[in-house]
């Protein structure tokens, strides 16, 4: 705020005022006028000072959370889960998974990953929620505590069709409601380290710290020393043809988490206002679905190696898998019937129709 004191008219000083308003105060000593040039922004600051909106304070509180410390806390427990899984200590794995899922740090991180970090956060499920305010995120972190999970049917997923990259075809996505996505993210944080300790080294799809470039490098390292025949296979409808009961048995997790995953798998699909039950597969679009598909396909390399004919046992074949794309590398051609018979035993959790492998 600036003050101009003297016997000047308002018209005389107005050209020098770039912003704000002019107010005059008549003084008692001879009528000398003091003209005040008041900045409007200063007035707004004064008027709003101490009157901060609740949403602003919640946003500040959310952003000021010690996220690095929370992530480190989760990572420490995940490392313990990984080591216990490596040693085959199932009871310790389940105890640590429960500890992680009940911790406030993991619940806050799970909500943040779904509502803030995830690229698909703006895609709504049937609940219609596209964005979540900071105060609602705190409430979600409290709601997804495992002790508050209700063991009843979940809301169905919303069917969305998106184009396949480089193709004219479209693939379906099943988008769960926002709160279910947060629960799935929390469950994934617990299950992922357990299964990372079990997964085959040549599996690269939907795994932390791995990419398609790593899969290409693995194939190159295999074929550069010796010539190899490469069989390119694509498991069609891998998400849609997973046998849910076999998958649940393969997970071998504790009852509460098993029931939650069973509810998500059988939530059903809502498309164009019509409900369809899901008796097979896992929705492609759920937070936990890629991990469940990797669990279903786990053991494929071992099954193919064991099913390899003894007449070709000079050098066992190698398998490089990225999600449902498989590269089978071998030093000789295997008869088609033998390959087909080995593929039928690749995974006990997949029920593939004839001609879909």
Roles of regions detected by a PLM:
Residues 75, 79, 91-94, 98, ...:
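Non-catalytic, well-ordered alpha-helical scaffold segments
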Residues 156, 198-202, 206-344, 349-357:
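Conserved polymerase palm-domain catalytic core
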Residues 62-65, 69, 171-179, 183, ...:
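Conserved aromatic-histidine-acidic binding/catalytic patches
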Residues 121, 126-170, 181-189:
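A contiguous, low-structure linker/loop signature
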Residues 1-140:
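Non-catalytic, polymerase-adjacent accessory regions of viral genome-replication enzymes
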